């Protein structure tokens, strides 16, 4: 059996990096990726939704060119550049990962406003249950749509979810050309400084 077959049939989480085939990428549409979550995290990072590459391999922000893992490292959240396949190591430092919308698509543009709003409600319930100190939503457009905050900007938000502080960061996808790696790392560093206060 291949590693992929074992993963799909036994729910085993594969930690050895591998690259999906074109067929596996196409088959990943609509799939989900398990949350990396625990109660009382320092920060719960929240992507918009899994891309096809991420869903195919079963690990968050896995597509080559995604800047999430380099930004975490550059901002000092991790002591080394983690592979997406080592995502569970984040829990040791008090960090986790989830998504606003759980289903995988080729691009976030394929999500409807209803999906984002429903995802925002589901995420708020998850935050109330797990009680992270901070929720970092990675994508201002998704935050605006999911929480009906059309004028939201990057940074700390005025509202909280329960006692959880909400912070919005840019989408780290390589498809987001508005923010280069250095600017992204600086914005992640601002969150790190706030959490460490």
Predicted regions and their residues:
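C-terminal capping/extension of enzyme domains
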Residues: 4, 8-34, 38-39, 64, ...
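Short amphipathic alpha-helices and their capping/turn segments at secondary-structure boundaries
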Residues: 32-38, 81-90, 126
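Short, hydrophobic/glycine-enriched beta-strand segments
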Residues: 37, 42-48
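Short, solvent-exposed loop/turn segments at secondary-structure junctions
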Residues: 49-53, 102-105, 141-143, 173-175
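Short, surface-exposed acidic-centric catalytic microdomains
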Residues: 54-114
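Short glycine-/acidic-enriched loop or helix-start segments at secondary-structure transitions
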Residues: 54-57, 144-148, 178-179
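Internal catalytic-core helix/loop-beta-alpha segment
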Residues: 96-146
């Amino acid at each position: 059996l291949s590693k992929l077959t074992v993963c799909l049939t036994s729910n085993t989480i594969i930690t050895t990096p591998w690259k999906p085939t074109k067929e596996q990428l196409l088959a990943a549409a609509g799939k989900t990726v398990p949350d990396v979550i625990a109660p009382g995290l320092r920060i719960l990072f929240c992507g918009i939704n899994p891309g096809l590459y991420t869903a195919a391999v079963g690990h968050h922000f896995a597509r080559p060119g995604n800047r999430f893992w380099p930004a975490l490292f550059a901002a000092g959240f991790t002591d080394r550049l983690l592979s997406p396949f080592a995502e569970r190591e984040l829990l040791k430092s008090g960090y986790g990962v989830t998504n606003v919308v759980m289903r995988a698509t080729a691009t976030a543009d394929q999500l409807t406003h209803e999906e984002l709003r429903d995802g925002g409600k589901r995420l708020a319930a998850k935050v109330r249950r797990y009680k992270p100190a901070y929720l970092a939503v990675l994508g201002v457009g998704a935050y605006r749509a999911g929480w009906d905050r059309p004028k939201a900007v990057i940074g700390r938000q005025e509202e909280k979810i329960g006692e959880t502080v909400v912070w919005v960061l840019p989408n780290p996808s390589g498809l987001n050309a508005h923010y280069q790696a250095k600017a992204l790392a600086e914005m992640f560093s601002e969150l790190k400084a706030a959490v460490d206060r």
